[in-house]
């Protein structure tokens, strides 16, 4: 059946929804531990430079493709080319969110569990050694939390673009900003935290390495929602009178600012707690669920800060999972002509089935691995390290070789809107973006198989 395509009410609706997609676990969880691991301020500096060039270019390109066609990734690619090899790029963009959102929802379920424990006054419990591993290995508890998070996401998707996604983003994003400011101020004013602030904000060239560059580029996919089909989909919901460059610049600045705030929330606090112990700063993915509860438990008002922090993370996780799910649902609506209700229901079933593999992968299914990885780790590797760089390369080829930079410029400058960084866009989309995406692809695969160390 045909469906009426939804749309955002205006610029603010697009900016907050797209920023909500970007300000997810990638910024709150992944960015701080990568910054801590790869040199602090030097990582931040490299990331900002890349966000202003690589990130800016890809956001403009994907949003423009979506608005030009009014379609989700598969339909957008088909609108410009009938070559099967290139149209595969559209399908890769469409499949990525279908694979990401199930395991993403599992992590969202973990956040719900921690928030519930803090609300019940169990800050000491979650700070105990072995709590996290005990929780995720308990198949029933982990699965229930995952299902609750999934249900929250689907309920918002059922409501539609303006009444669901946009309305929720307008509520959650301001709260997220306020909470991040409160926690960051509290964190940087702890005794001993200023050394952590210095590590995160004052560049030290001795900490620079090639892996700093590669890791910052990889993080950008998460932080700016690049190559996930989200920006093409959200671009298709953007009204023609909304200026693309200023809107996407706002998204870029907003997402980067929240990533910096996340670093200020976490790195100084961990630095103060550990006395600058490098092993604590480089705890990796366990930073949020193992190290941070210990940090909060050692602080005054630790329970209150824990509630605020995990509420913030829950909002961030929800806004991103909503965007990922919407991208997948939009593709099902466009390509199979399903109603929103049917497309959302089918996507929900897929989320439960695939997500359960990741949820149970540390418990009852712990002995089942794919190329030596647990299900969650495998889906993360497949999407982030393989499919997303390929999707980015496909978008670069589509814009530079098929659509043409001039047509993208015409879309960006519609109604007299400016395109101030057109020269940067031209150079990046033709040469540098595909080159860097290829570097990420090769480096990530080499690291996964142990050929290089990241």
Residue ranges and their predicted role:
Residues 1-29, 58-63, 67-80, 84-91, ...:
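Membrane-interface "cap" regions at the ends of multi-pass membrane proteins
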Residues 2-4, 8, 166, 170-318, ...:
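Membrane-embedded translocation segments of transport machinery
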Residues 2-5, 33-38, 73-92, 105-162, ...:
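Inter-helical loop and helix-membrane interface segments of multi-pass membrane transporters/permeases
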Residues 7-18, 42-46, 84-98, 144-149, ...:
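Select transmembrane alpha-helical segments in multipass membrane proteins
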Residues 10-50, 232-235, 246-249, 253-256, ...:
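Transmembrane helix-boundary motif of multi-pass solute transporters/channels
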Residues 34, 38, 85-100, 148-172, ...:
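Membrane-water interface regions at transmembrane-helix termini and the short interhelical loops
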Residues 35-61, 141, 387-391:
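Extracellular loop-to-transmembrane helix junctions
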Residues 143, 376-399, 420-454:
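A generic transmembrane alpha-helix motif of multi-pass inner-membrane proteins
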